Amino acid sequence: MVEEQLPLEFAPANTNTKQAKLRYSEAFYSVQGEGKFVGVPSVFLRTFGCNFRCMNFGLDRSEPMRDEKQKSGIIHNQEVQGLLDSEIHKTTNRFEDLPIIHTGCDTYASIYPEFKHFNRLATVDEVVEHLISLLPEGKWTMDNGQDVHLIMTGGEPLLAWQRLYIELFEHPKMKDLKNVTFET
């Protein structure tokens, strides 16, 4: 059996699942705004780490392709590079205070190692408590019968953390969760 080796910044903090920790940038309650489940109440868990660099979202088609940019040493789009040059990642204390960008990956603080310190590192129990605290009625099925979905997003939510997802989904406080979407 060959085990996939991930860059250290994306690997779980500990491979012993009883003490392993999940790195995530944020969790929040909102209404799903994309895909088949538009309009459904949802809790989003945005994990840290991504093996892609989607620099060209929102840019004109005349912009050089990502591979061309990387060959010439460009690893961030201009907006992210501008933030790094301004050293905002060193002077801002909270993930929530980082500016929204309009080109490239909009979750830059969830993918680039330079922003890793903004992310939480939590046990499965701690993540579950955080998710439950975000539910309007503290449970995955509301009193009116409406299910609240869990949206696993990122970064790339299927990168290294999947070993912890079984423990997360089998947690006793997650037993009423019926719908999970992975945004990759």
Regions found by a protein language model. Give the residues of each.
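Conserved N-terminal beta1-alpha1 strand-loop-helix module at the mouth
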Residues: V38-V43, T47-F52, V128
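S-adenosyl-L-methionine
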Residues: E26, Q32-V38, S42
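Conserved Radical SAM active-site core
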Residues: V2-K18, L22-S25, F52, N56-T184
